[in-house]
């Protein structure tokens, strides 16, 4: 991260002799328009990186965790930001979580029940790194895709979650988003609507429904 930040801010080419990376010449051209930096968001769960983001006045990104575990991370971040002499705003905290939105809670739950009763499809995303999967194969340990989005702020992976963070009709999904906003200080959300067994027309219908029924509620937060 130090290398990236210097590359974005240093006006002249420079050499880098770090612990992990050595480069004879580093230069970014054209220069970033934003000064001193474009918005930088650090996606992390580890305490040392959370503190790094806070001390360097960088944004924080959290992905796919339940609200309780997300709050544990954002509470640390905001406390360390205060220690560093600044207060992060909502735009500094980003959350990424999967969504399935339907006209009613009943329809959303019906889809989810059908998903839980089937085996994971081939398009479930691989959120762990390939190297971890290879290492698991080498030592004969289990590598279960179904649990990759469950975990704790310390980064361990437990459970059998299918990773749908926002599920329900418009009012339910709006209230779920509001809980992340109120408890975690999150002001930016990134939600992949494409889920297992959801085709493109259904995704477009979800997005239209979200814009028509959920966004007006979010604007009132």
Question: Which residues make up each language-model segment?
Answer:
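An alpha-helical appendage that flanks or caps ligand/catalytic pockets
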Residues: 1-29, 68-186, 219-221
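Glycine-rich, proline-tolerant flexible connector loops at the mouths of alpha/beta enzymes
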Residues: 64-65, 192-203
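Short glycine/threonine-rich loop-to-helix capping motif typified by GTGT followed
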Residues: 103-107, 199-209, 219
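Glycine- and acidic
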Residues: 58-59, 162-163, 191-197
